[in-house]
Amino acid sequence: MIDLSSPGAVRLDPSGFEALVDAARHGSAGAPLEAKEALADERLDGVMSVMLDPAAVLRLVVAGPDTRLEHRGWLADGVLVLLLGVRTDLLQLMKTPPAFLPATLVRLTRMRPRHLPERVPAQFAAARLDELVSPDARLRAPALAEANADFAWRLDFWWDGGGRSLTAVDGDLGLRFAYPEVGRLVPVTNTFGYRVLSTVMAST
């Protein structure tokens, strides 16, 4: 499914996205009609070329005990293309200036100001960080419970010659960043979190 009926972002399901990428990569001659129509849509001008030859790639996974959404991004030539997970079966494809990335990440990670009591770091094994955002809820839910978190997120950002990764948890105890080298979840302010997200592209 590729939905071009509404203004703004293009909505599609995972199979529609795969068909769109395949048509852009191999040519639209044998592609489904909806993929051909999407490639001709002005909203996708310059989008597929960025996705097929990016200077940098990002992935953000946001996961609670019962739900998990994955968001992806591609950056090249001053254009940021985002594929946002609305539901597991519904995606939203759009392009935006790279300067909007920090605000987008803040919204997707649900970062917000809060008044919290004094907090202390908590032990959490580095080997279990993947479980916080695992596709398997049987691993994810107990890991989140052990971390005393309502949800977790993992941001991965890769570019030619390097990459960065950050795992965080959030909930009643506020935002905490994972520091795998010491096996701890460390409380941070939302201001600090925003600053970190604002520098995610600094090395590209």
Regions found by a protein language model. Give the residues of each.
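Short, surface-exposed polybasic-aromatic patches that bind anionic ligands, especially phosphate groups
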Residues: M1-T204
